[in-house]
Amino acid sequence: MRKAKLILDRDYEISPVDKRIYGSFVEHLGRCVYTGIYEPGHPAADENGFRRDVLNLVKELGVPIVRYPGGNYVSGFRWEDAIGPVDQRPKRLDLAWKTTEPNKVGIHEFAAWARKANAEVMYAVNLGTRGPQDAQRIVEYANHKGGSELSDLRIKNGAKDPFGIKLWCLGNEMDGPWQMGSKTAYEYGRIANEAAKMMKWTDPTIEVVACGSSGSGMPTFGEWEYTVLNECYDNVDYVSLHRYYGNPHNDTADFLASTMDLDQFIRTVGSICDAVKGKKRSKKQVNLSLDEWNVWYHSNEEDQKLYKREPWGTALPLLEDVYNFEDALLVGLMLITILKNADRVKVACIAQLVNVIAPIMTRPGGGAWRQTIYWPLMQASLFGRGVSLMPRVECEKADTSHYTDVPMMDAAAVMNDGGEVTLFAVNRDLKEDMELKIDLRAFGTFTKAVHSVLHHDDVKAVNTEACPDQVKPREMNADLRENTVVLPAASWNVIRLLP
């Protein structure tokens, strides 16, 4: 059995945890909206056509904010197409995903659904094929009380009260050649700055997110962030990061080490923000919005076949990754990395919420179930609210195909207002259990410990509609007398220490 030690001190804080790091993402892509959250005629549909069974799973997940409506989709989207009488809305070709969009769900319907889900809306504006004036107009439509043409139009369309959307994305992945209206860093920085100014002049209470690089592998990564922020630093609040990982070569140990890369990515972008801050002699800190993150690779080949079989279809089953147990472990490790960077990462949205690379799956006309990755997301959101503490981990390390000195255990710790401390830990070792000694200096005495474990002997095990509980957390014995717990091989662990 491997040995590890975790040292915590209540005075060694990283930062208060912004609850928005447990956010998600709904894009008009595949079956995320249609036959995902929205399916009129389904036995579980409410009066507005939204599935109650899906809504209940979303509420259980504890998602505080949802990014909408894209994604690549937003760079060709006209928000006016999705307001007014539903039967009069146009169908449009979506060039981003080669499908047909019926516009049955728009800002009115989605805002009403988000309220039921106890979630805020994080709205993305189109800065690809549109510009600053259109971005200002949607803020006026959504957030202005009344008395102007656009706010009165919202009232006419059934929403007397403003939607009160507080967080806005200035486009999506504008460095990507796959993006409609992609731009150079300077071009985008100028447009983002003007859009942010006009949006904030309309509603001074909002915050905005500038597009960072689409990923750290982009040829302009780093240079893009610096150039963009040089143009818009004073008017933006966050810069976005997007990061996905996969295991196409079936190298689980290397796959589980991927968060070494994520941590470096986060720290690098934070440093670039600070470099621009220093250059401008600014007192303002721009923070990070990791508003797309997940495992994504299972469905890639099938998606290409589907495009050939059904060009320009509606609600096609695109990006429907079926997640296995090792994917859940990596999602847990990514959550740990986010918590350890809580001083800079203030927003994070797992992409996406339902069916499309998602923790929740549905069958049209049928059931809804939790994928393996649902569990670490739910537990982190439920127990990871409070102050992120600085963990000192002592454990063995190993090398993988692409990474060196990978700790066999990674962990984060959060203390809530009631003095409860929750540890999130992953044992990366695929074969050996790990005895973890927890050193709680300066904490005093805890009266009770609760240890939840997510483990399966088969790292490729999945949850399905027929077998939805193949991979599910279970409670284990926790004895505080020795301040020691056992982390099973290849496991996600939630250890709650109650005062």
Question: Where would I find each of the regions flagged by the language model?
Answer:
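Non-catalytic accessory regions flanking glycosidase/transglycosidase catalytic cores in CAZymes
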Residues: M1-W224, L229-Y238, L262-D263, R267-Y307, ...
